[in-house]
Amino acid sequence: MKRERLMSINKEKAEAAIYQFLEAIGENPNREGLLDTPKRVAKMYAEMFLGLGKDPKEEFTAVFKEHHEDVVIVKDISFYSICEHHLVPFYGKAHIAYLPSDGRVTGLSKLARAVEVASKRPQLQERLTSQIADALVEALNPKGTLVMVEAEHMCMTMRGIKKPGSKTITTTARGLYKESRAERQEVISLMTKD
């Protein structure tokens, strides 16, 4: 799949745009250190945007019927994404909890794969959090879903306010975890426990 996505971008157009950008900032794209930069940057963005055109829900290919009716939590799923406002990285960890319905569970790696697909595109952290939750709800129809994303945004670290180390935390709850504050708080305490 990686090869398919890398080949699906318009490589010539991307390289030409990067070449023009280098000229626009006063650089000489033909100097030794920059000769292959347009090609390298186009290839890098193709890899960083592997999630474009994919639905995170499609990552839930393994669904099992088990006798498990209690919460399932996978935390500290590392990810990186690209802020769609400034095209610089934001990165951090996603924590996912769901309460199975009728014993329907998924492979744990599928949760990480859904995060990967949703994050590898120009993105907003708020949307990323919701897309992960929605994919899980559509795939498993759990009684409750809660997703928490913690990230550092380079657009706040490198430019503007310049506050390195600051983190943004977003949460999205569905089902029981949206309806019941007590249930939601219990899951959040498990997610944030070291």
Curated annotation (Swiss-Prot):
SUPFAM superfamilies hit by this protein: Tetrahydrobiopterin biosynthesis enzymes-like
Pfam families: GTP_cyclohydroI (PF01227)
GO BP terms in the entry: one-carbon metabolic process; tetrahydrobiopterin biosynthetic process; tetrahydrofolate biosynthetic process
Keywords linked to the UniProt accession: GTP-binding, Hydrolase, Metal-binding, Nucleotide-binding, One-carbon metabolism, Zinc
Listed GO MF terms: GTP binding; GTP cyclohydrolase I activity; zinc ion binding
Aminoacyl-tRNA synthetase found in the keyword field: no
UniProt name for this protein: GTP cyclohydrolase 1
Organism of origin: Streptococcus pyogenes serotype M5 (strain Manfredo)
Catalytic activity of the protein: GTP + H2O = 7,8-dihydroneopterin 3'-triphosphate + formate + H(+)
UniProt KW Zinc keyword: yes
Binding, Zn(2+): C83, H86, C155
The EC number(s) this enzyme carries: 3.5.4.16
Gene3D superfamilies reported for this sequence: 1.10.286.10, 3.30.1130.10
Pathway(s) of this molecule: Cofactor biosynthesis; 7,8-dihydroneopterin triphosphate biosynthesis; 7,8-dihydroneopterin triphosphate from GTP: step 1/1
The protein's assembly and partners: Toroid-shaped homodecamer, composed of two pentamers of five dimers.
GO cellular component annotations of the record: cytoplasm
Domain of life: Bacteria
Disulphide linkage map: none
Sequence similarity: Belongs to the GTP cyclohydrolase I family.
